[in-house]
Amino acid sequence: MRLGFDHYTIAHRGLTPEQALWFAREHGLEGVQFLEPASLDADLDPGRLAAVRRQAEALGLFLEIGLPSPNPVRLSRQEGREVSAAEHASRLRPHLEAVASLGCRDARAYVGDRHDRFRSDVSWSSQVAATAAVLRELRPTLLDLGLKVAVETHADLTTDELLKLVSDVGEDVLGVTLDTGNLLMRLDDPLRAAERLAPHVRMTHVKDCVIAFTPRGLSWQARPVGSGVVPMTDILAALARANPALNLSIELHPRIYDLPIFDPGWLAHFPALRPSDLAAVVRLAADCERKYAEGSLQRPEVVEAIPWDVRDLEWLARSVGYLRPVVGILSGL
């Protein structure tokens, strides 16, 4: 397992792709995951993409990449008209070709942001079905290029929904990008979810998190890897058993997210929620509250008062410091 980071962690610093690769090298990391090919070159210029690939290879770094969302409902909303599955797939094909030109075999993608599940104009199930239709349109291209789309646990899909999507579209063209911290945002028991997803995981976003009780239910905040309540060593062990060559890409960011589980209307958007999963998340919140009370863990609002550009590098360094020995142990298994 090699240890890298997702460019989103330092996107606010305005580094070019070349500078981001050097940043990884200078900070002892082994690779970079970028948002999508257009973040390397807006025109998907083959020469420009080839230059980034050559630099990564020269520095001995792995290069990972994502795609624009295959959810056509998001694009329809942006353009104010209905975009068909065939049209959206045709727009994504040049991005897939760019992914292949970078030497990548997998491309991260997300179905929705944290708001899409709760939209009143288009149901979440309709959005997932529309996304599946786009991905089916892309099957021949993916097979021809030898690529898989690795759909992320992106504060949108539950584990059940993601596994069904992989099954419906086909394991030969679809996999998973596992975000370790986001699992709790969709009310999944993180360890159980990771164990179920592990056989399909192709890419990662490794982050920790904390949970707190609020008058509306819960709040969620990312934390440096190893400093929160995600059962990280157990999750990483499950991933290592399934794929010892998996890259681990650290992804960290600011902000506190609201999880109003006391609101029946909000909770109704999780019709298949298992009591055991919700109980696992609430138990982790209780663990956090105990640590807040004893002073061994800072409350989310205290941490969030610190500007992100003041804590980003420290968080990254702490995450690397935690993961290095863990990866070393897992690599020896």
Residue ranges and their predicted role:
Residues 14, 42-46, 156-160, 184-187:
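Loop/helix-junction capping segments adjacent to catalytic residues or to phosphate/diphosphate-binding pockets
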Residues 41-47, 69-90, 113-126, 216-223, ...:
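Surface-exposed, active-site-proximal loop segments in enzymatic domains
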Residues 1-104, 136, 171, 272-333:
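N-terminal pre-domain/capping segments
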Residues 57-58, 62, 75-175:
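Active-site acidic/histidine proton-transfer and metal-coordination neighborhood
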Residues 2, 18-25, 159-173, 184-333:
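Histidine-acidic metal/acid-base catalytic patches
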Residues 6-10, 35-39, 68-72, 112-114, ...:
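Active-site beta-loop-alpha junctions enriched in small/polar residues
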Residues 45-51, 85, 89-92, 124-135, ...:
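Charged helix-capping and loop-helix junction motifs
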Residues 3-8, 32-34, 61-67, 107-109, ...:
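Hydrophobic faces of well-ordered beta-strands that scaffold small-molecule active sites
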